[in-house]
């Protein structure tokens, strides 16, 4: 139904919307792993994503999404907005996976990088691996050094933008 409604919202005729829905879904769902699935999921989520982006913008929160993974981040506490965020998502027909939903306010880790005091850093275990160069091949050691340098550069650039 959501895929069909999305095609209708993009001004496809009901017949074409029905055909496209049949071509891009399996047993009423967007199939995981199909070449079209990411595109369809993003198109279906556009309206909801725009609402969430507008809310985030109003409160100076960074909002990112990749298919069904949503991240909200800010240097300020926005716990009071969580019910509104959940309402927007559910009102648009999506189901929240409460097992995968969490609010983290102290040193959040996003894709393995730690955010602390508006700065990015690599986790302690990463630094220990880097210091224990004997357990790594020279190529691995150089790769880890370059990764840490990249995180440090991004963090420094972000800090300069805050000044």
What are these regions (language model features)?
Residues 1-34, 43-54, 75-163:
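Right-hand nucleic-acid polymerase module
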Residues 33, 37, 58-74:
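Catalytic palm active-site di-aspartate
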């Amino acid at each position: 139904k959501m895929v069909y409604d999305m095609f209708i919202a993009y001004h496809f005729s009901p017949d074409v919307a029905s055909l496209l829905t049949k071509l891009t879904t399996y047993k009423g769902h967007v199939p995981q792993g199909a070449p079209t699935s990411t595109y369809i999921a993003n198109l279906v989520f556009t309206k909801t994503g725009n609402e969430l982006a507008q809310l985030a913008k109003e409160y100076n929160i960074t909002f990112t999404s990749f298919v069904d993974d949503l991240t909200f981040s800010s240097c300020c506490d926005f716990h009071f907005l969580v019910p509104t965020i959940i309402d927007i998502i559910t009102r648009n027909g999506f189901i929240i996976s409460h097992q995968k939903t969490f609010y983290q306010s102290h040193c959040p880790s996003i894709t393995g990088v730690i955010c602390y005091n508006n700065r990015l850093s690599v986790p302690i275990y990463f630094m220990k691996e880097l210091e224990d160069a004997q357990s790594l091949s020279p190529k691995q050691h150089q790769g880890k050094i370059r990764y840490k340098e990249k995180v440090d550069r991004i963090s420094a650039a972000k800090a300069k933008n805050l000044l």
